[in-house]
Protein backbone atom coordinates (compact mmCIF):
# COMPACT_ATOMS: atom_id res chain seq x y z
CA UNK A 1 0.00 0.00 0.00
CA UNK A 2 1.38 3.39 -0.91
CA UNK A 3 0.27 6.80 -2.07
CA UNK A 4 -0.93 5.24 -5.34
CA UNK A 5 -3.69 3.49 -3.39
CA UNK A 6 -5.16 6.89 -2.47
CA UNK A 7 -5.54 8.24 -6.03
CA UNK A 8 -9.33 7.66 -6.10
CA UNK A 9 -9.89 8.82 -2.50
CA UNK A 10 -10.81 12.37 -1.51
CA UNK A 11 -7.69 13.76 0.20
CA UNK A 12 -9.79 15.62 2.77
CA UNK A 13 -10.98 12.23 4.07
CA UNK A 14 -7.47 10.87 4.62
CA UNK A 15 -5.82 11.02 8.01
CA UNK A 16 -2.27 12.23 8.42
CA UNK A 17 -1.23 8.88 9.89
CA UNK A 18 -2.48 6.96 6.83
CA UNK A 19 -0.60 9.27 4.50
CA UNK A 20 2.56 9.04 6.63
CA UNK A 21 2.42 5.25 6.49
CA UNK A 22 2.01 5.33 2.70
CA UNK A 23 4.90 7.80 2.32
CA UNK A 24 7.26 5.64 4.39
CA UNK A 25 6.14 2.57 2.48
CA UNK A 26 6.85 4.25 -0.87
CA UNK A 27 10.25 5.59 0.24
CA UNK A 28 11.35 2.35 1.85
CA UNK A 29 13.78 4.11 4.18
CA UNK A 30 13.86 5.88 7.52
CA UNK A 31 12.73 9.49 7.59
CA UNK A 32 12.99 12.35 10.04
CA UNK A 33 9.70 13.40 11.60
CA UNK A 34 9.95 16.90 10.09
CA UNK A 35 10.38 15.41 6.61
CA UNK A 36 7.37 13.14 7.12
CA UNK A 37 5.25 16.12 8.21
CA UNK A 38 6.36 18.14 5.16
CA UNK A 39 5.51 15.28 2.78
CA UNK A 40 2.12 14.78 4.43
CA UNK A 41 1.42 18.52 4.19
CA UNK A 42 2.27 18.55 0.47
CA UNK A 43 0.15 15.50 -0.29
CA UNK A 44 -2.90 16.71 1.65
CA UNK A 45 -2.53 20.34 0.49
CA UNK A 46 -2.91 21.62 4.07
CA UNK A 47 -1.86 25.05 5.29
CA UNK A 48 0.87 25.57 7.86
CA UNK A 49 -1.75 26.59 10.42
CA UNK A 50 -3.79 23.41 9.90
CA UNK A 51 -0.69 21.24 10.23
CA UNK A 52 0.43 23.11 13.37
CA UNK A 53 -2.95 22.47 14.99
CA UNK A 54 -2.94 18.77 14.12
CA UNK A 55 0.75 18.16 14.82
CA UNK A 56 0.47 17.06 18.51
CA UNK A 57 -2.21 14.50 17.67
CA UNK A 58 -0.23 13.28 14.67
CA UNK A 59 2.90 12.77 16.78
CA UNK A 60 0.86 10.92 19.40
CA UNK A 61 -0.68 8.74 16.71
CA UNK A 62 2.75 7.82 15.36
CA UNK A 63 3.89 6.83 18.84
CA UNK A 64 0.84 4.72 19.59
CA UNK A 65 0.28 3.21 16.15
CA UNK A 66 1.97 -0.18 16.11
CA UNK A 67 2.99 0.16 12.47
CA UNK A 68 5.61 2.85 13.19
CA UNK A 69 8.80 2.63 15.19
CA UNK A 70 10.93 5.46 16.49
CA UNK A 71 14.57 4.92 15.61
CA UNK A 72 15.79 7.62 17.99
CA UNK A 73 16.64 11.25 17.35
CA UNK A 74 13.13 11.77 15.89
CA UNK A 75 13.74 9.40 12.96
CA UNK A 76 10.89 7.05 12.09
CA UNK A 77 10.53 3.78 10.18
CA UNK A 78 7.94 1.09 9.60
CA UNK A 79 7.98 -1.81 12.03
CA UNK A 80 7.44 -4.31 9.20
CA UNK A 81 10.93 -3.55 7.90
CA UNK A 82 12.54 -5.26 10.89
CA UNK A 83 12.47 -8.73 12.35
CA UNK A 84 10.99 -8.83 15.82
CA UNK A 85 14.34 -9.69 17.43
CA UNK A 86 16.21 -6.97 15.55
CA UNK A 87 14.00 -4.03 16.58
CA UNK A 88 15.88 -3.25 19.80
CA UNK A 89 19.25 -3.56 18.06
CA UNK A 90 18.27 -1.10 15.31
CA UNK A 91 17.01 1.61 17.65
CA UNK A 92 19.62 4.27 18.39
CA UNK A 93 20.20 4.64 22.13
CA UNK A 94 21.85 8.07 22.66
CA UNK A 95 22.56 7.28 26.30
CA UNK A 96 24.66 4.30 25.16
CA UNK A 97 26.97 6.37 22.94
CA UNK A 98 29.76 6.29 25.55
CA UNK A 99 32.76 4.01 25.24
CA UNK A 100 31.65 0.57 26.43
CA UNK A 101 35.19 -0.51 27.36
CA UNK A 102 35.69 2.43 29.71
CA UNK A 103 32.40 1.80 31.50
CA UNK A 104 33.19 -1.84 31.98
CA UNK A 105 36.58 -1.06 33.51
CA UNK A 106 35.06 1.24 36.12
CA UNK A 107 32.61 -1.33 37.45
CA UNK A 108 34.19 -3.60 40.00
CA UNK A 109 32.36 -6.61 41.33
CA UNK A 110 32.14 -6.75 45.10
CA UNK A 111 31.19 -9.81 47.08
CA UNK A 112 29.28 -8.60 50.12
CA UNK A 113 29.52 -12.00 51.78
CA UNK A 114 33.30 -12.17 52.09
CA UNK A 115 34.55 -13.48 55.42
CA UNK A 116 37.45 -11.06 55.56
CA UNK A 117 37.08 -7.44 56.58
CA UNK A 118 40.04 -6.06 54.67
CA UNK A 119 38.22 -3.26 52.88
CA UNK A 120 35.36 -0.89 53.33
CA UNK A 121 33.34 -2.82 50.75
CA UNK A 122 32.20 -5.42 53.27
CA UNK A 123 28.72 -4.80 54.62
CA UNK A 124 28.15 -5.19 58.34
CA UNK A 125 24.74 -6.81 58.57
CA UNK A 126 24.84 -6.83 62.37
CA UNK A 127 24.80 -3.03 62.47
CA UNK A 128 21.95 -2.23 60.13
CA UNK A 129 19.06 -1.55 62.50
CA UNK A 130 18.59 2.20 63.09
CA UNK A 131 16.73 1.46 66.34
CA UNK A 132 19.90 -0.02 67.80
CA UNK A 133 21.82 3.23 67.47
CA UNK A 134 22.55 5.11 70.68
CA UNK A 135 21.51 8.69 70.10
CA UNK A 136 23.51 10.18 72.97
CA UNK A 137 27.26 10.14 73.57
CA UNK A 138 28.50 7.97 76.44
CA UNK A 139 30.48 10.88 77.89
CA UNK A 140 27.35 12.98 78.23
CA UNK A 141 25.30 10.12 79.65
CA UNK A 142 26.65 10.51 83.20
CA UNK A 143 25.92 14.23 83.23
CA UNK A 144 22.43 13.68 81.88
CA UNK A 145 21.66 11.08 84.54
CA UNK A 146 22.59 13.51 87.31
CA UNK A 147 20.39 16.22 85.90
CA UNK A 148 17.58 13.89 84.97
CA UNK A 149 14.85 13.56 87.54
CA UNK A 150 12.77 11.02 85.76
CA UNK A 151 10.44 10.79 88.75
CA UNK A 152 9.44 14.41 88.26
CA UNK A 153 8.02 13.68 84.84
CA UNK A 154 5.23 11.57 86.30
CA UNK A 155 2.72 12.60 88.92
CA UNK A 156 2.18 10.28 91.84
CA UNK A 157 -1.55 11.03 91.90
CA UNK A 158 -2.13 10.77 95.60
CA UNK A 159 -5.78 11.53 95.03
CA UNK A 160 -6.56 8.33 93.10
CA UNK A 161 -9.84 8.12 94.98
CA UNK A 162 -11.22 10.96 92.86
CA UNK A 163 -10.87 8.83 89.74
CA UNK A 164 -13.45 6.33 91.02
CA UNK A 165 -16.23 8.88 91.26
CA UNK A 166 -17.05 10.18 87.80
CA UNK A 167 -19.75 12.78 87.76
CA UNK A 168 -22.54 12.03 85.33
CA UNK A 169 -20.36 9.60 83.41
CA UNK A 170 -21.74 6.77 81.38
CA UNK A 171 -21.25 4.45 84.35
CA UNK A 172 -23.92 6.35 86.28
CA UNK A 173 -26.40 5.90 83.45
CA UNK A 174 -25.97 2.14 83.19
CA UNK A 175 -27.86 -0.16 85.47
CA UNK A 176 -25.91 -2.78 87.34
CA UNK A 177 -27.11 -6.33 87.48
CA UNK A 178 -26.54 -8.43 90.54
CA UNK A 179 -26.60 -12.21 90.80
CA UNK A 180 -30.06 -11.89 92.37
CA UNK A 181 -31.35 -10.14 89.26
CA UNK A 182 -30.08 -12.97 87.09
CA UNK A 183 -31.78 -15.56 89.31
CA UNK A 184 -35.09 -13.66 89.04
CA UNK A 185 -34.87 -13.68 85.25
CA UNK A 186 -34.34 -17.45 85.20
CA UNK A 187 -37.34 -18.04 87.46
CA UNK A 188 -39.66 -16.13 85.16
CA UNK A 189 -38.82 -18.33 82.18
Swiss-Prot record:
| GO BP terms, alphabetized | DNA-templated transcription; regulation of DNA-templated transcription
Please state every residue range assigned to the domain named HTH HARE-type.
Answer: 14-81
Molecular function (Gene Ontology), one example: DNA-directed RNA polymerase activity
Under the cellular component aspect of Gene Ontology, which terms does the record hold? DNA-directed RNA polymerase complex
* Family the UniProt entry places it in: Belongs to the RpoE family.
Explain the purpose of this protein.
Answer: Participates in both the initiation and recycling phases of transcription. In the presence of the delta subunit, RNAP displays an increased specificity of transcription, a decreased affinity for nucleic acids, and an increased efficiency of RNA synthesis because of enhanced recycling.
- Protein name as annotated: Probable DNA-directed RNA polymerase subunit delta
Amino acid sequence: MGLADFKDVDRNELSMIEVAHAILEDRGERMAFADIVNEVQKYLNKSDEEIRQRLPQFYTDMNTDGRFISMGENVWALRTWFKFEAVDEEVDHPEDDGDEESTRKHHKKVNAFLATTEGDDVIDYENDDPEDEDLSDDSDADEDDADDNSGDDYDDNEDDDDDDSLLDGIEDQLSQMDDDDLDDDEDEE
